[in-house]
Amino acid sequence: MALREHEHEDQLSKEGFKHIYVWQDGPDTWYPDHVHPTATAHLIVEGEVTVTIKGKSRTYKAGERCDVPGGTVHSAKMGPQGCRYVVGEM
């Protein structure tokens, strides 16, 4: 059973993430290569997202977590049902 959103938020807070929020993207939303200045964590609640880092792609589904180190160039493409996720930023 996947954690509920508030449980994800609590988990990220305990890990030291300072800015925590829920985000939702529609079907097939695409974020081209970009960088976050600090580490980010994305805990998938519904749907899926494919994240590409250094030419390697991985799809994350509900119940999974994607961590991106600060300063890392990456892109993201939401699945056909979109994606809802809890984000933590340092």
Where are these regions (language model features)?
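Conserved short histidine dyad/triad with adjacent acidic residue
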Residues: 18-36, 70-71
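Short, conserved beta-strand element in jelly-roll/cupin
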Residues: 35-51
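A generic "binding-loop/recognition-motif" signal
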Residues: 27, 37, 56, 72-73, ...
